[in-house]
Amino acid sequence: MLVERKTMQGIISAVRRNSLAENAGIKAGEKLCAVNGVSVHDIIELSYLVADEQIVLTIEDSECRQRQIVIEKYTDEELGLEFEAAVFDGVTTCYNNCVFCFVDQMIPGMRESLYVRDDDYRLSFLYGNFITLTNMKEEDFEQIIKTHMSPLYI
């Protein structure tokens, strides 16, 4: 069973002092909806979308009002944004029932996040989480190929 990813925005958890984002008036708690008109699904995609000298950010405030901000920058210059989560559209979870699943074999009483049966290739790339590749959509494989995402832990 494949999970449809929902469109979400990246919730901004912090804005670094004296950064491009702070100078543009972006605040913690606001949401990044798009870069140059393209919806952003995760911090990996964000890094590709902002690698330009001029970008247009679509930001949503706490009252659901959107505004566009034009930022001129060096191609490798960071915006100074930090996000609540690395993926903005929800984590893909594993629906397999493998007898050898290490998550199912963990002892009780550990921290909650260890019991999440994530199967998200983005978390594999970012944090070294293991994935099965069985819960992926065609677009996921295309994104891996397009961005040369490696290593992935299978």
Question: What residues fall within each predicted segment?
Answer:
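PDZ/PDZ-like peptide-tail recognition elements
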Residues: 1-10, 48, 53, 58-59, ...
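Short, structured beta-strand/loop micro-motifs enriched in basic residues and often containing a Trp
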Residues: 8-17, 37-40
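A residue-level detector for short acidic-glycine micro-motifs
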Residues: 14-17, 34, 48, 61
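Short, surface-exposed secondary-structure edge patches
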Residues: 20-25, 47-48
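Terminal peptide-recognition signature
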Residues: 21, 29-32, 57, 101
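Conserved PDZ fold ligand-binding element
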Residues: 23-41
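Short, Lys/Arg- and Gly-enriched loop/turn segments at beta-strand edges
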Residues: 38-46, 65-68
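Conserved Radical SAM active-site core
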Residues: 64-69, 73-154
